[in-house]
Design a protein with these regions (language model features):
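Helix-loop-helix
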Residues: 2-4, 9-260
Length: 260
């Protein structure tokens, strides 16, 4: 159900994006006013504040975005750690069912064991697919808003930051962004129960490949955003893992609150 809701939200956002993009260049319309203008104003203000360094302005904006999203991210880690504690508690029963399921060839017996497994999940109130997609959904309009603010700002596009131009693709930044998100994807698995880790292993490769594919033909400002954001995500993951691994009772509070 959650996957369907997420897909619908993504489609709805795409409709808003397509209907608003034509007006962005003229700085009018709902899409520009809600998503692009805040970044347009922020980029110019911070660029002036840092002596014309729009690259540094993008770094600071990314840090601010990650700090705003941090409570949502930590809540997701908290929920995942709570699930992990419950999965550990039910592991002996789960492994016994899995062993019997592997040994039997009888279709009817397999159906019974699968139902028994579902009953075990229900008994312990565990949903192995409960990932928490809100932080991802929130980021979509943020990334697009920042991208269009840069796209229609000649000053930002012409700015030289470090060794590259913010308005042109840069292969080195593309590779750095991909490497950061590969490591971030691996680190993110640490907060998940073992069952979720198996389901999400492919994500380790899909995420950085998508980042590099988009960055390869986009302005270097985009992989700058992703690189800084990815590093901050890694730090947030370490914070969430350290706190909730050392305080499993706090993680379980999240699961109990959700029940109520």
């Amino acid at each position: 159900m959650k996957k369907k809701i997420t897909l619908l939200m993504m489609m709805a956002f795409a409709v808003v994006l397509l209907s608003g993009c034509s007006a962005v260049e003229n700085k009018e319309g709902m899409f520009y006013t809600v998503f692009v203008k805040p970044f347009d104003v922020s980029l110019n203000y911070l660029g002036d504040l840092f002596g014309g360094s729009y690259g540094l302005a993008i770094v600071v904006i990314t840090i601010i975005i990650r700090l705003v999203l941090m409570p949502f991210m930590l809540r997701t880690y908290k929920r995942q750690q709570g699930m992990k504690v419950k999965m550990d508690a039910m592991r002996p029963e789960m492994e016994d069912i899995q062993k019997r399921l592997k040994e039997t060839k009888d279709k009817e017996e397999q159906m019974k064991l699968q139902q028994e497994m579902m009953g075990l999940y229900k008994k312990h109130e565990v949903n192995p697919l409960n990932m928490g997609c809100l932080p991802v959904v929130i980021q979509m309009p943020i990334i697009m808003g920042l991208y269009f603010a840069i796209l229609h700002s000649p000053d930002v596009q012409a700015h030289e930051f470090l060794w590259f131009s913010l308005g042109s693709p840069d292969i080195i930044m593309t590779l750095i962004a991909g490497a950061v998100y590969f490591f971030q994807a691996k680190v993110s698995l640490w907060t998940m129960p073992e069952q979720q880790q198996k389901q999400m292993k492919l994500f380790i490769y899909i995420s950085p490949i998508m980042i590099m594919f988009i960055s390869f033909t986009s302005m270097a400002a985009l992989p700058v955003y992703w690189t800084v954001g990815g590093i901050l995500l890694i730090i947030q993951t370490f914070i969430g893992r350290k706190f909730y691994s050392n305080h499993p009772e706090k993680a379980l509070e999240s699961v109990e609150e959700k029940k109520e």
